[in-house]
Amino acid sequence: MDVCMLEKALSDKTKAVMAAHTLGNPFDLQAVKDFCTKHNLWLIEDNCDALGSKYVIDGEEKFTGTIGDIGTSSFYPPHHMTMGEGGAVYTNDPLLNKIARSMRDWGRDCVCPSGMDNLCGHRFDKQYGELPLGYDHKYVYSHFGFNLKATEMQAAVGCAQLEKFPSFVERRRHNFDRLHKALEAVSDKLILPVPAQNSTPSWFGFLITCKEGTSKNTVVQY
């Protein structure tokens, strides 16, 4: 990611920067975070490739996905951990938390957890748009949304995966080091990946870039 392009892309319509930690190798979070702070923008980290990666920002090492205003993860089978399908959105911001939960639950305006009603104490005493006064707030859908809740079985699989997750990350780093060492002999033909500055990647893939004179098809068919 060329962070120098951020200023060129900025306009009056810009509200957020969303960027991915491609293949587990973090982008320049310090530069992007500083840019977002300077221009009062949300920072959304697509952390689907990088669960378990770490980055040193402002002198403190943090997990990627926790530095921006929003982080995302994917639990599709090839990723660092799986629940069969689905993913997660995480944030420390109360407003973004409310918005994400609403979008997850069909755009529901009420934020009461499942099985708990009237936590706000105003379930039946307000008016919403042209709906009649006292309309049940639990069934007011004020925004667009989806039905994106995980099943209990998926959650159980996810909990089991979390227990094994540190070993998954360790194995991915081991495999990366093994591949890198094996391919150093042909580094005159290939550009091998290296960790971004100030980062400890949790690798999702191994990027190989062919140097001039080396055919991609030759590498693929080898």
Regions found by a protein language model. Name each.
Residues 1-98:
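Active-site phosphate-binding strand-loop segment of PLP-dependent enzymes
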Residues 2-4, 8, 16-20, 29-31, ...:
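PLP-dependent aminotransferase class I/II
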